[in-house]
């Protein structure tokens, strides 16, 4: 296994020099995609047109990577919700009002992090387009058996990145060339983008391997058929949102009337969700007997995780910054790591988990640090003044400066097993970062059944019984709560709240913005600097 990982790391290290970072829609980009031919053999096609793209799925700097880093996709999907909050703690975590702005939905059209996220996502789209052009050029004079699968994998990568653009920004340009002329770039309606992504994924799925890509081997960390199947289910689940070209009129299409052709049968959106979730079961995904297994230090053998970001502190540069950001300095120091004393659970999250009650959900102690803190040997952790470090979940608020709880308010992120051998302040750890997993698919199926007029109790309680939680009826309210209980800290809350029509409501520390009842904040603005470079791009309504 180690020899295999060494080979993969060499591939990825090499690839970082082969693709430069192209800022989509920039009038005079600093770096151009290389035009020299670097695909002269099938092995070079894999190296330079397929494997190279995976260097961007994870990351180590702000706004890069789908998860693991700050001020990017994950933060936009997490700290804009009732799940997590980063309180201002005196001189810490104000950062020009950035974190408060996210939580309050007051981000504006010139937000640097939103622009950097747009540029990151389009960078991978453009690199995927370049890869497809290289594969097609190679195929003109070669007929290697691997070519159709390689091309399908790159199309799937591009579709996945368009999925994130669709979810975050709504109406975006659909570009299928690596060097589009500025005058030819136009904005597509949200429904058009959705239909393109769905069609692409349906077409490539049969060409991809069914291997579980979270497990080490030739497909480790790659997009395989199960990853595409999960994405198809997720797209269908959100079809009412994604096919709505005007998300500010408080009217949505009905999922029962949104039709898809799936394996020769016409299915509505909810039937489509159920079909693809069932396909994951056929592909031998199941719940791990122990919830924690999915987030353990060596979680590659998980039969539940579907798509992960590979982590290896000696081979990869991918970072997991979230645990580092959340733990108090002395808490992290007790593990031999570092911390920034930041992100915490919201009051709403505590209430959903039933924190401190007789009915507290069993997953709370798995997902959060709360109360007195102990090191890995069981010794009490103390603050600098000699008092015991006690996290106080209920004292959390958006600004706790000059309060007695400035340093200790808030339940902190746990979920992933502590890797005491992690390096770079604890950000380079061995636990692979979980992006997609089967428990989510079961909850998607439960929701789809209920929305389609059927009973979703079986799937909901299959997830709950794994952690020995009491049975509940599968109402939409209970399903939304269960998604927070099961998927805390996994980056799904914003999407879930939007689908359930609850993203713009007021809650603790967050009043509703003027006109927010229209739903305009359910998508982010097209970055203003991007619009200046291309005046054809129309700003999203409300901004």
Pin down the residues of each PLM region.
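Active-site beta-strand/loop architecture of penicillin-binding DD-peptidases
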Residues: 393-437, 542-543
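Conserved, well-structured interaction surfaces
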Residues: 43-51, 55-61, 65-66, 88-169, ...
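Long, intrinsically disordered, low-complexity segments
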Residues: 20-21, 121-124, 196-198, 219, ...
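Bacterial N-terminal signal peptides that target proteins for export
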Residues: 1-9
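Bacterial Sec-dependent N-terminal signal peptides
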Residues: 3, 17-44, 159, 197, ...
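An aromatic- and glycine-enriched ligand-binding surface/loop that stacks and positions planar moieties
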Residues: 22-99, 172, 202, 207, ...
């Amino acid at each position: 296994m180690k020899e295999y990982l060494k080979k993969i790391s060499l591939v990825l290290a090499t690839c970082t020099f082969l693709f430069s970072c192209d800022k989509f829609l920039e009038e005079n980009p600093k770096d151009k995609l290389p035009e020299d031919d670097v695909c002269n053999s099938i092995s070079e096609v894999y190296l330079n047109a397929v494997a190279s793209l995976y260097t961007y799925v994870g990351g180590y700097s702000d706004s890069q990577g789908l998860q693991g880093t700050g001020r990017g996709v994950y933060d936009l999907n997490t700290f804009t919700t009732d799940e997590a909050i980063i309180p201002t703690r005196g001189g810490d975590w104000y950062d020009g009002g950035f974190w408060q702005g996210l939580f309050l939905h007051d981000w504006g059209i010139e937000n640097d992090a939103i622009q950097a996220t747009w540029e990151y996502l389009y960078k991978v789209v453009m690199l995927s387009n370049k890869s497809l052009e290289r594969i097609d050029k190679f195929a003109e004079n070669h007929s290697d058996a691997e070519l159709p699968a390689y091309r399908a994998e790159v199309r799937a990568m591009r579709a996945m990145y368009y999925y994130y653009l669709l979810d975050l920004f709504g109406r975006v340009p659909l570009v299928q060339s690596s060097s589009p002329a500025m005058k030819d770039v136009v904005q597509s309606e949200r429904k058009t983008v959705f239909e393109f992504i769905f069609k692409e994924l349906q077409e490539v799925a049969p060409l991809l391997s069914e291997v579980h890509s979270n497990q080490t081997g030739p497909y480790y960390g790659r997009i395989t058929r199960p990853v595409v199947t999960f994405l198809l289910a997720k797209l269908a689940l959100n079809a009412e949102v994604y096919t709505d070209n005007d998300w500010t009129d408080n009217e949505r299409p009905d999922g029962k009337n949104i039709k898809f052709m799936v394996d020769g049968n016409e299915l509505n959106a909810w039937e489509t969700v159920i079909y693809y979730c069932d396909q994951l079961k056929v592909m031998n995904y199941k719940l791990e007997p122990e919830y924690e297994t999915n987030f353990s230090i060596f979680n590659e053998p998980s039969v539940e995780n579907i798509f992960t970001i590979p982590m290896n502190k000696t081979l990869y540069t991918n970072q997991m910054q979230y645990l580092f950001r959340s733990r108090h300095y002395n808490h992290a120091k007790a593990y031999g790591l570092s911390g920034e004393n930041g992100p915490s659970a919201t009051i709403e999250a505590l209430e959903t988990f039933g924190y401190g009650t007789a009915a507290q959900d069993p997953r709370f102690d798995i997902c959060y640090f709360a109360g007195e803190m102990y090191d890995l040997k069981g010794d009490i952790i103390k603050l600098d003044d000699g008092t015991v470090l006690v996290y106080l979940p209920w004292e959390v608020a958006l600004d706790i400066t000059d309060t007695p709880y400035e340093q200790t308010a808030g339940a902190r992120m746990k979920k992933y097993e502590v890797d005491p051998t992690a390096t770079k302040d604890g950000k380079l750890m061995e636990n692979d970062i979980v992006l997609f997993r089967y428990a989510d698919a079961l909850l998607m199926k439960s929701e789809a059944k209920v929305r389609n007029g059927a009973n979703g109790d079986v799937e909901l309680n299959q997830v709950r019984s794994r952690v020995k939680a009491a049975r509940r009826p599968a109402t939409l309210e209970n399903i939304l709560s269960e998604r927070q209980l099961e998927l805390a800290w996994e980056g799904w809350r914003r999407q879930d709240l939007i689908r359930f029509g609850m993203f713009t409501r007021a809650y603790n520390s967050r009043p509703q913005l003027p006109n927010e009842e229209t739903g305009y904040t359910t998508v982010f603005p097209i970055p203003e600097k991007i619009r200046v470079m291309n005046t054809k791009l129309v700003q999203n309504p409300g901004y």
